[in-house]
Every structure is written in C-alpha cells, then in structure tokens.
Amino acid sequence: MSKSLTIIWQYLRAFVLIYACLYAGIFIAGLLPITIPGSIIGMLILFVLLALQIMPPQWVNPGCNILIRYMALLFVPIGVGVMQYWDLLRAQLGPVVISCAISTLVVFVVVSWSSHLVHGERKVIGQKGKEE
C-alpha cells in the first residue's frame, strides 16, 4: 500500500508542477502587452526551473514520461481540425509545402551555424590535419 501511495504521489506531484508552470505562463501572458502564448511561457518557466536546478528533474519525470508516451493521441484533435478545412488546404497546398520546405532548410542552416559558433571546431581523434 505504501509503495502504491508513493507512486501516486510522484505522478500527482509531476502533473501539479507541470500544470502550475502552464497556468503561471497563461497568467503572465495575460499581463504582457504583446501576444505570446501562455503555454510557451509556461514551458520556458519549467525549463528555467529545471536548468537552474530549482526543481529536481525527478519531480516531473513521471508526468513527462506519460505525456511523451501518449503524445500521438494529443495530435488527433488537431488533425481532425485540419481536415475540416481540407478544401482550403488543398487550394493552397503548393505554397504550404514550399513554405514548409524552405523554413525547414532555414532551420537546418541556422542550427548548423549556431552550433559551429557555440561549439567551434574540435580536432577529431585519429584525424590527420595541420601540424602546428
């Protein structure tokens, strides 16, 4: 019985913390003069709490594992909503596909460039290069 209560407590704590960050983000988004989704601000709050080690990752792991495991189910309502506008989407399919492809390439280039900027070039062990 004690082990069951411990597991229930871990899941309850994880979801309470995740939702607390979400609702804090929604509250802050309501106060801001610019439009930023509250869920994005909530994720940033959760990230900062975890990155600064204010909140141990073990506290949110059980809830995150469940959300990741069932993530595909969370996209079903979005897919159904998109299918309601299939005629409009079909009429604009070319521009949508082109914009997705171009934005993907831009993301690849920006991530590659920023990765090289942050990490720099490192010598690979066993690779022959310039002798200094």
UniProtKB/Swiss-Prot annotation:
It is found in: Cell inner membrane. The chain crosses the membrane at residues 5-25, 38-60, 66-86, 93-113. GO terms for cellular component: plasma membrane. Its main location: membrane. InterPro entries: LrgA/CidA (IPR005538), Uncharacterised_UPF0299 (IPR022957). It is a multi-pass membrane protein. Keywords: Cell inner membrane, Cell membrane, Membrane, Transmembrane, Transmembrane helix. It holds the Pfam family LrgA. Belongs to the UPF0299 family. NCBIfam families: PRK01821.1. HAMAP family: UPF0299. This is UPF0299 membrane protein KPN78578_25390. It comes from Klebsiella pneumoniae subsp. pneumoniae (strain ATCC 700721 / MGH 78578).
